[in-house]
Amino acid sequence: MADKKRYEELINILDQYSYDYYVIDNPTVEDAEYDQKMQELLKIEEAHPEWVTPESPSKRVGGEVLEGFKKVAHDTPMLSLANAFNQEDLADFDRRIRDKVGDDIAYMCELKIDGLAVSLQYENGKYKQGATRGDGTIGEDITANLRTIRSIPMKLQKDYSIEVRGEAFMPKRSFQKLNEIREEEGQMLFANPRNAAAGSLRQLDTKIAASRNLDIFLYAVADFGEMGVETHSAGLDMLETLGLKVNKERRLCNSLEEVYAYIEEWTEKRAGLAYDIDGIVLKLNNLEQQRQMGTTVKSPRWSIAYKFPAEEVPTKLLDIELNVGRTGVITPTAVLEPVRVAGTTVSRASLHNEDLITEKDIRIGDTVLIKKAGDIIPEVIKSITEERSGSEEPFHMPKNCPTCDSELVRLEEEVALRCINPKCPAQIKEGLIHFVSRNAMNIDGLGEKVIIQLFSQHLIKDVADLFFLSKEKLLELERMGEKSVTNLLASIEASKQNSLEKLLFGLGIRHVGAKAAKSLAIHFDTMDNLKVADKETLTSINDIGEKMADSIVTYFANEEVHDLLEELKRAGVNMTYTGPKLEDMSEEELVFAGKTVVLTGKLEKLTRNDAKALIESLGGNVSGSVSKKTDVVVAGSDAGSKLAKAEELAIPIWSEEDLIEYLPDEGGLNE
């Protein structure tokens, strides 16, 4: 019969085996011995369930099925980091540090793990709770799933009560194996290890999380000062003595030159790591100096994340296809041999225009380098000419539209070729897609595939036809059931009440963007007033230049446009501005009256367009860059150089929550 002393001894033995294997990568026993000890432990726990504690190694295998994830408030906010993209950004950061605390500084440089930020709470040395970062103030309780990560100790080497921060991630090998299994089972593949790690930690079945072989690196304590250390580097060393896994590749740098060398080294070596990194984190090493620097609403002023340049990958250019946009612009698109770039498979990429293809001498059949601009949009950088075999074909832009065969023209001062046939089917189709989009009429359920079906089956020929669609016709479309058709018709009906600026933007008048549409709607109040306006009147309005004014006058001079507007009126589409008028609002309501506001970073609750609309409704003008003329910067998470520049210029910083306080009571924008 087992005694409790043996049970506790087994827990300590298995914890040590796990530490040796998962934390310091120095296994001391064979798998068979580990398994034998684990089986002995499980038998004891089966006989004595009253002895089982949350720290038992048996709890790492999962098995618990969760009902959901509770919200967890972080006692100390989990701030995000401002970004640097080049040496100039890093030099600016360094100068701000030196201006504040002097030249006696050092930076701890660490690899920026591409995973999921988490916090671990230990009470008297025992693992108590784990949570996601969330919005930095409130995260989700993922205690059970984090317990399945073998490199997280259930007990520290000392009985500290601390909150530790780190990055949970999926090693490359585990990611590859997971996707191989999912492919065999016909499941959707994960785009990258980061997404796989995040998805694994949000599994309600902890057995699934346990099977994913996640790992972690710890990089901070909520307050290192509580541990009696004076530097960040000493704090990391102490975490290691507690049995926590800290990345070994960190380096203390005493100058920017040493920082640059560290970055260059890991830019070259990153591919050889067993896990993904997407940059380097710099932290002012002295904790007292960190306190002097302080923090902004979203990020510490004493730390910054250098982001690696976009990944560049070679592949074969199979063909060049031409796309016709809603304004008739002909855009060449590269058809590529599929290749993975920055975590996703890319088979098409932008070539922008004919001049760029000629300038870069890009030929069909070339091996080309591609990257994702801003790690989002694939584009062709250049041809690798030394790999040419002689069979490659130079590309020549056709003289006629690939859709309607009309002659293409190049307008004055433009690099793009255009189809100027107003009846071009491709332009009409793209115009319809634009009309229903979120920034325009915002008709839910009318995605690109539905529009293409409606257009190809001749159920719509222009935007007015959308408002006369019948339930019977919609039910004939592929994948359109009773419920989806009912919802779509309700969305179409609701869109009729949109304010005038939404309709104006949706009509796709050349040069008229969402901002100009809003200015026009506010100034003229009705479509009838606008359509008779002359150039002089138009150019007297803010945001309306001569080129745009000419375009507006030309648009409304077209008899077909008059017919279209009459059809829209007949359908009951609103043609009046119904948004707030600045002159009707009090000074207190117009918090941004006459001010220039810049949005930066990722917003958690508002879309960028909603935030922009809210700022404009409060009298502000939204700008894309920070300067001395900027009055306010609204900063979301992961704000980069714009936030840093705003701080340097002492421009007031608002958080997203500050902005949300000014939402209308009805709780929505552009309803």
From Swiss-Prot:
List of residues binding Zn(2+): C401, C404, C419, C424
Cofactor(s) required for function per UniProt: Mg(2+); Mn(2+)
Keywords: DNA damage, DNA repair, DNA replication, Ligase, Magnesium, Manganese, Metal-binding, NAD, Zinc
InterPro entries named in the record: BRCT_dom, BRCT_dom_sf, DisA/LigA_HHH, DNA_ligase, DNA_ligase_CS, DNAligase_adenylation, DNAligase_N, Hlx-hairpin-Hlx_DNA-bd_motif
Domain BRCT: start-end pairs: 587-671
E.C. no: 6.5.1.2
A GO term from the CC aspect: cytosol
Cysteines joined through disulfide linkages: none
GO BP of this protein: DNA repair; DNA replication
Gene3D superfamilies xref list: 5' to 3' exonuclease, C-terminal subdomain, 6.20.10.30, BRCT domain, DNA ligase/mRNA capping enzyme, Helix hairpin bin, Nucleic acid-binding proteins
Pfam families referenced in this protein's UniProt entry, alphabetically: BRCT (PF00533), DNA_ligase_aden (PF01653), DNA_ligase_OB (PF03120), DNA_ligase_ZBD (PF03119), HHH_2 (PF12826), HHH_5 (PF14520)
Active site annotation, chain numbering: K112 (n6-amp-lysine intermediate)
Residues engaged in binding NAD(+): D31, A32, E33, Y34, D35, S80, L81, E110, R133, E167, K283, K307
Single GO MF descriptor: DNA binding
Catalytic activity: NAD(+) + (deoxyribonucleotide)n-3'-hydroxyl + 5'-phospho-(deoxyribonucleotide)m = (deoxyribonucleotide)n+m + AMP + beta-nicotinamide D-nucleotide
Entry keyword DNA repair: yes
Family assignment from sequence similarity: Belongs to the NAD-dependent DNA ligase family. LigA subfamily.
Role: DNA ligase that catalyzes the formation of phosphodiester linkages between 5'-phosphoryl and 3'-hydroxyl groups in double-stranded DNA using NAD as a coenzyme and as the energy source for the reaction. It is essential for DNA replication and repair of damaged DNA.
Protein's UniProt name: DNA ligase
Organism annotation: Listeria monocytogenes serotype 4a (strain HCC23)
High-level lineage: Bacteria, Bacillati, Bacillota, Bacilli, Bacillales
